[in-house]
Amino acid sequence: MTIPDLTAKVVLVDIEGTTTSISFVHEVLFPYAKQNAEHYLLETWETDATKQIVQDLQLLPQFAEYASTLGTQPAVDAQLIAGFVRYLIERDLKVTPLKTLQGLIWAKGYASGQLRGHVYEDVATAFHTWREAGLRIAVYSSGSVAAQKLIFQHSIAGDLLPHLSAHFDTHVGHKQQTESYTKISQILQVEPQHVLFLTDVPLEAAAARAAGMLTILLQRPGNVPLSEEERSSYPVVEDFVALHTLKQP
């Protein structure tokens, strides 16, 4: 499908596969969280934040499933919870307490300089161009809001956080549910037809479209190839350069 002459008041961007390479998330961020989970939990075990995360992790249905694989009734300690964190990450389960913990672990990595957020080279220019045109830019990702901010604040293109006016994660709802996008429109106080959602996942695009949003699919290097049906159902771009002419209605 060709790119229409688009107008929008808000550009809502996904992160993984849209502003940031999938490989950065899966080959850098996830392994970093797996490798550093136990150390972080040991360091912060007595803090209120970690206690809450540990409690929330144990309430997940997957926890009983994981514990049953260990053979005995294990003590709930940093080693056990770190093992469960690795279990969840290996299964790519996007559950909120895991995302919260990952965000805290990554925060230490960014602060130490061990991590820098990947963004595609066209992202910073597009953000600047859209802001100059008077558009707001918001982020909706399955990663926690804290983790989102870290990627853009400590990005390889510099601090991009000032360009972003709002952040949404799974607290607002899952990304393949129409209600999530309706709620985002309400929070942004803008009609859904004035929101352009950019993502690499057709099922997310379908949910956003059902809520009344404009949608465009990204076919970045390393993304899952789009089918002919998906390409005929949605406008598709390879980068943000084609969207520099985006303007307000």
Swiss-Prot record:
<comment type="pathway">
    <text>Amino-acid biosynthesis; L-methionine biosynthesis via salvage pathway; L-methionine from S-methyl-5-thio-alpha-D-ribose 1-phosphate: step 4/6.</text>
</comment>
<feature type="binding site">
    <location>
        <position position="16"/>
    </location>
    <ligand>
        <name>Mg(2+)</name>
    </ligand>
</feature>
<feature type="binding site">
    <location>
        <begin position="141"/>
        <end position="142"/>
    </location>
    <ligand>
        <name>substrate</name>
    </ligand>
</feature>
<dbReference type="Pfam" id="PF00702">
    <property type="entry name" value="Hydrolase"/>
</dbReference>
<keyword id="KW-0486">Methionine biosynthesis</keyword>
<dbReference type="GO" id="GO:0000287">
    <property type="term" value="F:magnesium ion binding"/>
</dbReference>
<dbReference type="InterPro" id="IPR023214">
    <property type="entry name" value="HAD_sf"/>
</dbReference>
<feature type="binding site">
    <location>
        <position position="200"/>
    </location>
    <ligand>
        <name>Mg(2+)</name>
    </ligand>
</feature>
<feature type="binding site">
    <location>
        <position position="175"/>
    </location>
    <ligand>
        <name>substrate</name>
    </ligand>
</feature>
<keyword id="KW-0479">Metal-binding</keyword>
<dbReference type="GO" id="GO:0005737">
    <property type="term" value="C:cytoplasm"/>
</dbReference>
<dbReference type="InterPro" id="IPR006439">
    <property type="entry name" value="HAD-SF_hydro_IA"/>
</dbReference>
<dbReference type="InterPro" id="IPR027511">
    <property type="entry name" value="ENOPH1_eukaryotes"/>
</dbReference>
<keyword id="KW-0963">Cytoplasm</keyword>
<comment type="pathway">
    <text>Amino-acid biosynthesis; L-methionine biosynthesis via salvage pathway; L-methionine from S-methyl-5-thio-alpha-D-ribose 1-phosphate: step 3/6.</text>
</comment>
<dbReference type="GO" id="GO:0043874">
    <property type="term" value="F:acireductone synthase activity"/>
</dbReference>
<keyword id="KW-0460">Magnesium</keyword>
<dbReference type="InterPro" id="IPR023943">
    <property type="entry name" value="Enolase-ppase_E1"/>
</dbReference>
<dbReference type="GO" id="GO:0005634">
    <property type="term" value="C:nucleus"/>
</dbReference>
<protein>
    <recommendedName>
        <fullName>Enolase-phosphatase E1</fullName>
        <ecNumber>3.1.3.77</ecNumber>
    </recommendedName>
</protein>
<keyword id="KW-0539">Nucleus</keyword>
<dbReference type="InterPro" id="IPR036412">
    <property type="entry name" value="HAD-like_sf"/>
</dbReference>
<keyword id="KW-0378">Hydrolase</keyword>
<comment type="function">
    <text>Bifunctional enzyme that catalyzes the enolization of 2,3-diketo-5-methylthiopentyl-1-phosphate (DK-MTP-1-P) into the intermediate 2-hydroxy-3-keto-5-methylthiopentenyl-1-phosphate (HK-MTPenyl-1-P), which is then dephosphorylated to form the acireductone 1,2-dihydroxy-3-keto-5-methylthiopentene (DHK-MTPene).</text>
</comment>
<dbReference type="GO" id="GO:0019509">
    <property type="term" value="P:L-methionine salvage from methylthioadenosine"/>
</dbReference>
<comment type="subunit">
    <text>Monomer.</text>
</comment>
<comment type="similarity">
    <text>Belongs to the HAD-like hydrolase superfamily. MasA/MtnC family.</text>
</comment>
<keyword id="KW-0028">Amino-acid biosynthesis</keyword>
<feature type="binding site">
    <location>
        <position position="14"/>
    </location>
    <ligand>
        <name>Mg(2+)</name>
    </ligand>
</feature>
